[in-house]
Amino acid sequence: MTNLIIFLFPIRKKSQRFEFKGYKLNAVTKNWQSYDNLYRMTCRALKSRIQDFDVKELSGGFFSAVYLIEADERKVILKIGPNRDVRIMRHELEYIPTEAEMLHKLRNIDILIPKLITLDDSGEICNEPYFFMSFIEGTPLSETEVTGYELDAIKYQVGRITRQICSNPAPYFAVPGLPASITTRNSRFVLTLVKWLLDDAAEKQISIPFIKPTELLNFIDSYSHTLDEAIPCYAHTDTWDGNLLIKDGKLNGLIDFAAILYADPLMSHDFHDFNAKPLDSFLRGYGKTSFTENEMIRIQIYRIWQRLGMIVERGYRCYDDSNIYAWVLDKFVKEVKKMKALGYINRLL
């Protein structure tokens, strides 16, 4: 048992952070609007005829067009879904309505998140759904220099927030807004997520390194009993450094709630991010500092799912920089090798 734990979670002293400084992440999914449209959308949302109006495209984010809007001295954020003619991944089909719904549902939780102002899916001004939310001051952690002490405090807070989100039970496992994903079994849900990614990859002829799709699905299916130990809750699967807003060295806000799933709490991002193991500071904040063997197996499966998603995403976004986060290919292979070794170890036990 000890060897298995060391194999899955080797010790690493420092947080491994991936930064995107200097990038303007322009993707085909970003549905930029004209100045006139933005003005009309804002007047409708704020229910006033605005006199002083200014807009700024925000360069962060990997999916939606996002604007910082100043309207008569009020700052708000506008987020717009992709044009319907743009092909997006299966799990992304309801991203904008889902994020608006999650902001509304989580509004009474004591965490630092934007407040939903309005969702408009009428198509009367903009051809796709969009929503306005409150502005939170701060710079993404991915673009901020912090001390080791500050980073520990930030990740501790992320752990506390993650626990608060996960404390909300979900009625079933699902991608919110996508009925085809609904199931009462976590194993069926995880297989659906992975199969959707593999189908998305096949349709765009995106190569998945080192492992055949059927082999990956069969391996995950072989751990159905382990996956099915999970109980569904709200799980934020994208609390990476780019979604953490920092002010004066402290966490001042968490953004991007489109990636909340009804899922295993261990599917929350910081359990399976790019560190060799979950950070101690995060785990202390979450209130869980040890794992059973089955929990570690589930985390390992989620590490592969998360990296697979990034590989497929690169082929759908068509970023200006075609090599952006190409490093994830090697990370995926590394996790698959761990998975294969894990299967071999278990056959010997």
Language-model-detected regions and their locations in the chain:
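Hydrophobic/aromatic-rich alpha-helical bundle segments in the mid-to-C-terminal region
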Residues: 315-330
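Polybasic, lysine-rich low-complexity intrinsically disordered segments
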Residues: 13-14
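Hydrophobic alpha-helical segments that form the core
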Residues: 300-312
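Phosphate/pyrophosphate-binding loops and the adjoining catalytic core of nucleotide-dependent enzymes
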Residues: 8, 18-27, 343-349
